[in-house]
């Protein structure tokens, strides 16, 4: 039964965009490197390379690397540990009662920034900023409940999985770019040696077209991934609500961690988080007793 609960949390509508993102990129690689059909001999090296990158990204090494890139460090100050760790333990125990299949422990790291913020990384890491310490205990617990929701639904682990896939896909896109540069170089040499206008023209056209196509493909695929990330914010908010932190989380989102995508349709489509008003409204629809006015 536990495995079905785990699969149920992963295969949700909110993760549909992530799945489409993954399938589109894998489909592109297979189309480029297996143009005459997918055979075991052709696909096996690709699968092995992909599995290796995914295993590395899902390992503690991948989690540690992502935390390091985010600037997250181990908490050394005793006063910060005394303040935060008991609050996280309370929320974590509540989450374990609701989701017994969760990891057995959570690591807490800190980022030295003054704006209040927190985010989950991998399977068991939550990062907080210095600014979060300015919130009340109840508000910090509400933020923890949201981040624990990401861990419970394995959103951050899926992001690591996608990160490994991106590393794999980026390598192949780099190969494509190198091939394009080589072809451009050939056109350039032909144009120089023959003093041909058309050689230079085709070189410029091919280089520009290949760059634009790769950029468009990347942006198109990212639309689906960003959609999933925004939907998963609602899912984590709902998890916090079910743990009893709905009204407090709505207050934090409204007063301390207000976020709004930049103006414009495209910027909104590529935003990682929904507008704070939308998140507060969703919590109110769930039953959170919160009103700012």
Question: Model-derived features: where do they sit?
Answer:
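Juxtamembrane "helix exit" motif at the C-terminal ends of alpha-helical transmembrane segments
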Residues: 25-40, 170-195
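Peri-catalytic and regulatory segments of divalent metal-dependent proteins
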Residues: 57-148, 152-156
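N-terminal low-structure segments adjacent to metalloprotease catalytic domains
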Residues: 1-55
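Transmembrane alpha-helices and immediately adjacent membrane-cytoplasm interface residues
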Residues: 44-70, 213-225
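Membrane-interface, cytosolic juxtamembrane amphipathic helix immediately N-terminal to a transmembrane helix
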Residues: 1-16, 139-167, 232
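Metalloprotease/metallohydrolase-associated module, dominated by Zn2+-dependent proteases
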Residues: 2-3, 15, 180-251
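Post-HEXXH active-site segment of zinc metalloproteases
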Residues: 155-185, 250-259
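Active-site-proximal gating segments in proteases and membrane effectors
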Residues: 98-122, 221-231, 235, 240-293
């Amino acid at each position: 039964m536990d495995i079905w609960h785990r699969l149920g949390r992963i295969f949700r509508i909110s993760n549909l965009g992530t799945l489409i993102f993954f399938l589109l990129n894998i489909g592109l690689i297979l189309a480029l490197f297996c143009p005459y059909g997918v055979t075991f001999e052709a696909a096996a090296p690709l699968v092995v390379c992909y599995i290796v990158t995914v295993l590395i990204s899902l390992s503690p090494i991948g989690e540690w690397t992502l935390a390091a890139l985010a600037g997250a460090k181990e908490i050394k100050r005793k006063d910060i540990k005394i303040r935060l760790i008991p609050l996280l333990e309370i929320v974590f125990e509540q989450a374990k009662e609701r989701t017994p299949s969760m990891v057995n422990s959570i690591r807490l790291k800190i980022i030295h920034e003054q704006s209040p913020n927190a985010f989950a990384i991998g399977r068991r890491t939550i990062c907080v900023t210095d600014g979060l310490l300015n919130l009340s205990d109840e508000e910090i617990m509400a933020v923890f409940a949201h981040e624990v929701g990401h861990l419970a639904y394995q959103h951050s682990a899926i992001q690591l999985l996608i990160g490994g896939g991106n590393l794999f896909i980026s390598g192949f896109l780099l190969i494509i770019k190198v091939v394009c540069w080589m072809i451009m170089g050939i056109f350039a040499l032909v144009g120089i040696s023959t003093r041909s206008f058309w050689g230079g023209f085709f070189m410029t056209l091919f280089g520009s077209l290949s760059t634009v196509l790769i950029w468009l493909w990347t942006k198109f695929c990212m639309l689906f991934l960003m959609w999933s990330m925004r939907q998963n914010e609602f899912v984590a908010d709902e998890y916090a609500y079910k743990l009893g932190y709905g009204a407090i989380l709505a207050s934090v989102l409204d007063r301390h961690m207000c976020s709004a995508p930049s103006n414009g349709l495209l910027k909104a489509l590529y935003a990682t988080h929904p507008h704070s008003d939308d998140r507060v409204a969703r919590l109110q629809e769930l039953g959170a007793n919160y009103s700012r006015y």
